[in-house]
């Protein structure tokens, strides 16, 4: 059995696409390839170029493949659905354009849950309506990921 190990821009401290502290996306690709990796995750949508005609050749010239992407958005918050949907659509488009097979959905940190992080017995729980909305938003993006 062969195990393939890739990397991700978060290894370079990239958590948000427009953070001025981020290294250049080309630096991330260069150093990832130099370290011997052959696969990389997309990082936050907007960090790497969204134009496949720019990112594709950059990956290919370094013998790298885009292997997946993460949507880190406020799935718990119906007021932020448009932002969540936008980030999800853009991520799925990039994954499809480059043949990546892995889509990871992560609910962002909330002011409500942060104070009890790591202590589930103390955490305030979603009510039935909140839970149903959360699940439906996740399902919507999961379907998009399988259909794109």
Model-flagged regions — what are they?
Residues 59, 106-111:
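Short glycine-enriched loops at secondary-structure junctions
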Residues 111-117:
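Short acidic/His/Gly/Ser-rich catalytic and metal-binding motifs that mark active-site loops
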Residues 1-102, 123-147:
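N-terminal pre-domain/capping segments
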Residues 117-123:
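Intrinsically disordered, low-complexity Ser/Thr- and acidic-rich flexible linkers and loops
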């Amino acid at each position: 059995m062969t195990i393939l190990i890739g990397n991700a821009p978060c290894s370079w401290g990239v958590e948000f696409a427009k953070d001025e502290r981020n290294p250049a996306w080309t630096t991330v690709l260069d150093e990832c390839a130099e370290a011997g990796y052959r696969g990389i995750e997309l990082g936050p949508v907007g960090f790497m170029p969204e134009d496949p005609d720019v990112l594709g050749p950059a990956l290919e010239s370094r013998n790298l493949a885009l292997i997946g992407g993460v949507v880190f958005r406020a799935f718990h918050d119906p007021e932020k659905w448009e932002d969540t949907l936008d980030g999800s659509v853009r991520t799925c488009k990039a994954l499809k354009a480059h043949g990546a097979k892995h889509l990871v959905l992560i609910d962002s940190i909330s002011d409500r849950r942060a104070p009890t992080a790591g202590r589930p017995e103390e955490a305030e729980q979603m009510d039935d309506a909140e839970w149903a909305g959360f699940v439906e938003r996740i399902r919507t993006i999961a379907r998009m990921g399988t259909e794109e």
